[in-house]
């Protein structure tokens, strides 16, 4: 406790038991996207902007072979044909799947909204990024991050069904974060007047209840019997004693036992999903920024 307060002297000592130190990384998300686009171009990819997908195209056998698109600057519509069509549109994944008239689409996405607030570092001077429980009995963890003379803190985690292009920071988001940060740093006394900027983003989470920390039905725990059944069926599959369908049946049964209740947003898995439809449309969704290269390699 004493060492934690030496590192973070403004931290509230009440109920503080201790802390830990871990390594983390930071990145510029917009720059990361641009660098990936540049590298794809270097490797022969054709980059287009302001072009919107409208329909999924199929060949005479019903297999996906391209996309009909519209240039939003000129209004021109045209077809783009390809051997593979991969849907990597994040929160919009279900919308793209619905463009495929050969699919019966069951929604798989559960987008949640995350909000950060920004104050001047003179108002909240944290020496290094700090990660702590929100203190609001919701299972959330919150960051306070110093960067370039400012301090960011967040994030929230709430279900979102609004405009995906323009998620808004609501008063409830601000109130939640101000209460959380002032509970942990009471001497700072941060108010709405200290907030210089804010932003909201969407997490493209998978709706299925597959996370290890799921808090819904069956107390969110996989029973020992179910765990043994999964291990046994996978072992038999590796020995070629059962089919892939047998493995899927066991996993589907396990999922159904965990889906009695809808988990809260923070309990939804941050894992990824790779789906190949019968007509060949590939959808890669979910995941985290730290996994994006692994996800891409797995899809290819």
What feature does the model see in each segment?
Residues 63-67, 127-128:
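Short, hydrophobic/aromatic-rich segments at coil-to-beta transitions
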Residues 87-103, 297:
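Flavin (primarily FAD) binding-site architecture
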Residues 1-35, 42-44, 48, 60-62, ...:
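Flavin (FAD/FMN) cofactor-binding and adjacent substrate-gating region
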Residues 21-22, 67-71:
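Short beta-strand segments that buttress and anchor functional surface loops
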Residues 39, 101-153, 158-300:
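C-terminal catalytic lobe of FAD-dependent flavoproteins
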Residues 46, 55, 81, 141-143, ...:
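Short, surface-exposed charged micro-motifs
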Residues 73-84, 88:
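Core beta-strand elements of the Rossmann-like FAD/NAD(P) dinucleotide-binding domain
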Residues 50-54, 71-73:
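Conserved SAM/SAH-binding loop
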